[in-house]
């Protein structure tokens, strides 16, 4: 677009000289002063692009009209309007050429018919006017009521009368007003009904009971409390008896032999005997060899004749038992040494252990 502006400026400078000649009458000089379409300066610009041909032709036509018609003021604003209109005659301007002018020209701000005054100011004016009207009407109404109150005292009460009545009720000037409930002007509107105070006062004025009646009432209350306390005592006694009965039944089931026993001594003897028997069984299971030796000793004591033979047998058995035990130990050591070499260990069998069974 700068290039087009430069061309227009050149055309204007060139157009000044022919206009001077036109005033003297030289028409040839007018034609010769303007560059032709076939010149070298104009030809490259015309062939630069097909999209600018229309604009260039219009400029040439305008230049010719201005040169032949005489002096005519052709401002830059008119040229800009025509130049911008050329770009939208059926095609779009693609590229940077002409983009600067379009961006520089800001769109005009739209104008609306509405007034841009603050609405809050209008509202404030309206509300002030309304308040003035309302206040005037209220003043008129109150004045009319005041006049009616002076002339007709039996009419509707004014605000002053209601305020005076409330003050008198609060201060309690008269006794009759003290007994009556306080009447507030808006109490019925908010609460729906007056506060019922006289009922409580009437209840307090009931006849008092005599001393005899009071004594009778206390006696009746004492009897009732005693009956309740006695019932509470009977309940734990019955529960205690039932618990004892259950404990006795359990003991009888556990110790059935205690039924026939009358005294506690036989029970002690029986428990001792049971304990001794349990100990003997335990020793027999754990140490069967000692139990055999004990039986033989008891038999030798009972039969002294065969005691010598028994003693010989016992000594022989002891020697044999020790010999067998030594053999087992040697075998165990040999086995353990072999298993240690092979990475194995010997496990005892059930024959080497005595199982305790009760």
From Swiss-Prot:
Disruption phenotype annotation: Defective shoot gravitropism. Increased angle of inflorescence branches.
Record carries keyword Glycosyltransferase: no
GO BP, sorted A to Z: negative gravitropism; positive gravitropism; regulation of auxin polar transport
Primary localization class, coarse: membrane
Membrane-protein topology: Single-pass membrane protein
Motif segment (Nuclear localization signal): 231-253
Compartment(s) of residence: Cell membrane; Nucleus
Any Gene Ontology CC annotation: plasma membrane
Tissue-specificity statement: Expressed in shoot apical meristem, vascular tissues, stele, endodermis and upper portion of the inflorescence stem. Expressed in the endodermis of inflorescence stems and hypocotyls.
Keyword Lyase: no
Motif IGT motif per UniProt: ranges: 90-96
Residue stretches spanning the membrane: 87-107
Keywords: Cell membrane, Growth regulation, Membrane, Nucleus, Transmembrane, Transmembrane helix
Family the UniProt entry places it in: Belongs to the LAZY family.
Protein name stated in the entry: Protein LAZY 1
Gene: LAZY1
């Amino acid at each position: 677009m700068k290039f087009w502006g430069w061309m227009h400026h050149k055309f204007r400078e060139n157009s000044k000289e022919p206009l001077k000649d036109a005033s003297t009458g030289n028409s040839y000089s007018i034609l010769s002063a303007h560059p032709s379409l076939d010149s070298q300066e104009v030809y490259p610009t015309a062939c630069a692009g097909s999209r600018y041909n229309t604009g260039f032709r219009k400029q040439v036509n305008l230049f010719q009209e201005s040169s032949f018609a005489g002096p005519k003021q052709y401002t830059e604003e008119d040229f800009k309007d025509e130049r911008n209109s050329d770009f939208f005659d059926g095609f779009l301007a693609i590229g940077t050429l002409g983009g600067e002018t379009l961006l520089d020209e800001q769109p005009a701000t739209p104008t609306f018919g509405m007034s841009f005054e603050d609405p809050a100011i209008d509202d404030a004016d309206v509300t002030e006017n309304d308040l003035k009207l309302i206040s005037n009407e209220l003043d008129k109404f109150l004045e009319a009521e005041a006049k009616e109150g002076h002339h007709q005292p039996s009419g509707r009460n004014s605000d002053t009368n209601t305020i005076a009545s409330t003050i008198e009720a609060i201060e309690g000037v008269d006794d009759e007003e003290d007994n009556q409930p306080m009447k507030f002007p808006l109490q019925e509107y908010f609460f729906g009904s007056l506060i019922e105070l006289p009922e409580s006062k009437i209840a307090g004025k009931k006849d008092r009971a005599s001393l005899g009646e009071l004594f009778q009432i206390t006696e009746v209350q004492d009897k009732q409390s005693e009956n309740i306390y006695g019932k509470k005592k009977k309940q734990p006694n019955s529960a205690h008896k039932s618990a004892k009965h259950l404990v006795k039944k359990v003991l009888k089931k556990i110790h059935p032999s205690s039924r026939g026993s009358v005294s506690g001594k036989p029970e002690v003897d029986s428990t001792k005997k049971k304990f001794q028997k349990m100990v003997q069984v335990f020793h027999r299971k754990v140490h069967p060899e000692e139990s055999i030796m004990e039986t033989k000793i008891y038999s030798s004591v009972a039969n002294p004749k065969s005691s010598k033979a028994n003693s010989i047998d016992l000594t022989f058995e002891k020697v044999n038992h020790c010999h067998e035990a030594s053999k087992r130990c040697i075998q165990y050591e040999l086995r353990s040494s072999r298993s240690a070499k092979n990475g194995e260990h010997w496990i005892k069998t059930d024959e080497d252990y005595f199982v305790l069974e009760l």
